[in-house]
């Protein structure tokens, strides 16, 4: 094994550890030092692997994030609790620095699929650790009834489930592309964990993500073939989903889905969690209408929930959280990230249609899930967005390479045409 190959594999291991440690050890004080150490290790090993020198990048990834973090800090001037806002700004800055260090290494990768496989393996590590932590029997029991849901003992169970669901989406993409099919065996612990956590968001992510991977696989087919395969895929997906929900381990999540629908329709037993979240959206929007420009200060939403609900927590909705705490400017500065990414995915879609489609669907799922969670300060979410920026740079390079190749073909064609004209005139 060459030095480059050894370092390449070692970086993969460190990166898997980094993405897994976000969830496994986020609650520990030393966690932030582990994040930084792993990030630096990836970059330093990368310099050694490529015989490279230290070069910093100042691109749109840096600009957009710095503008948002700077505005978060600015809201401390009028925040109800300036210290809470400053603490949040510090957390965002630390997370960005770790993500930026990793970005500097992976942005030079020719193929972004390496990063996706790292995420997939990180999800498998989290699932296996969860099985060892809770015990297989306990997790199997936890999925059988909504009252037995796994607790947030070492990490938030929704975050664990979402990480596992993303692994399923990436594994499905690998399967359809006929790569690493043997790793499908790790879907067993992943599905057990999703069932035990009873995360409705993770179940929806799993369903939409796997089906989307099927659509991406057929992206280069003709319209008729694509349409036919999508219809067939829909039928198969419905049958698989129905089959999964009949399993005892998914009984709890099925009950929670039913009570959630009841809370919207007003029929049957309603889900208290969904009703509370609806109330949070309502009071958050009310607070935004009273402070539309600058809000009440980032990370100050607990003042709102304490005032109206008697509990100190966040609003469980990223859109309302940003609007009520940071006003319209916080909303614009943060979601400028998504606007930039979607715009460039569309602009460079022809560089690699499958890659662009996969990331567009993933980004769309992330955006939709913001309706049920506060994600702007999540370490995992910020690293996911960093990967999307890496993907954009990768698509740009592919687009430039195609343009250069097309220019060469055009120049070659002109020369041939010129020579043929000479031969005729002679």
Placement of each model-derived feature along the sequence:
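Aromatic-anchored transmembrane helix interface
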Residues: 61-70, 82-105, 114, 118, ...
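A membrane-periplasm/extracellular boundary helix in multi-pass inner-membrane enzymes
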Residues: 196, 214-266, 285-290, 424
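Hydrophobic transmembrane alpha-helices and their immediate junctions
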Residues: 117, 180-181, 215, 219, ...
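N-terminal signal-anchor transmembrane segment
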Residues: 1-49, 68-78, 366-368, 383, ...
């Amino acid at each position: 094994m060459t030095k480059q190959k050894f370092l390449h594999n070692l970086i993969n291991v460190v990166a898997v550890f980094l993405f897994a440690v976000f969830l496994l050890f986020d609650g520990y004080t030393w966690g932030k030092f582990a994040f930084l150490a792993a990030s630096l290790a990836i970059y330093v090993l990368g310099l050694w692997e490529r015989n490279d020198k230290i070069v910093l990048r100042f691109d749109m990834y840096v600009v957009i994030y710095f503008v948002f973090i700077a505005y978060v800090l600015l809201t401390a001037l009028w925040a109800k609790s300036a210290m809470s806002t400053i603490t949040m700004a510090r957390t965002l800055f630390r997370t960005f620095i770790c993500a930026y260090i990793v970005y500097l290494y992976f942005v030079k990768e020719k193929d972004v699929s390496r990063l996706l496989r790292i995420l997939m393996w990180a999800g498998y590590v989290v699932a296996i650790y969860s099985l060892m932590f809770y015990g297989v029997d306990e997790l199997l029991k936890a999925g059988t009834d909504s009252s037995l849901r796994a607790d947030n003992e070492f990490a938030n169970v929704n975050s664990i489930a979402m990480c596992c669901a993303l692994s399923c989406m990436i594994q499905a993409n690998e399967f359809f592309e006929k790569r690493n099919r043997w790793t499908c065996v790790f879907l067993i612990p992943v599905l057990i964990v999703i069932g035990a956590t009873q995360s409705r968001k993770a179940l929806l992510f799993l369903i939409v993500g796997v089906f989307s991977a099927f659509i991406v696989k057929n992206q280069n087919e003709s319209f008729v073939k694509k349409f036919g395969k999508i219809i067939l895929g829909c039928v198969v997906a419905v049958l698989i989903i129905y089959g999964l929900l009949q399993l005892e381990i998914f009984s709890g999540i099925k009950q929670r889905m039913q009570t959630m629908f009841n809370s919207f329709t007003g029929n049957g037993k309603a889900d208290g969690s969904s009703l509370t979240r609806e109330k949070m959206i309502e009071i958050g929007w009310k607070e935004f209408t009273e402070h539309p420009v600058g809000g009440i200060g980032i990370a100050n939403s607990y003042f709102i929930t304490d005032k109206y609900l008697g509990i100190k927590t966040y609003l469980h909705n990223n859109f309302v959280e940003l609007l009520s705490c940071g006003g319209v400017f916080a909303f614009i500065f943060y979601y400028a990230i998504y606007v930039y990414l979607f715009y460039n995915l569309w602009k460079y879609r022809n560089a690699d249609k499958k890659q662009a489609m996969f990331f567009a669907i993933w980004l769309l799922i992330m955006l939709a899930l913001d309706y049920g969670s506060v994600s702007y300060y999540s370490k995992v979410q910020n690293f996911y967005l960093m990967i999307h920026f890496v993907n954009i740079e990768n698509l740009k390079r592919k687009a430039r390479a195609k343009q250069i190749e097309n220019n060469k073909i055009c120049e070659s064609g002109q020369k041939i045409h010129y020579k043929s004209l000479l031969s005729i005139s002679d």
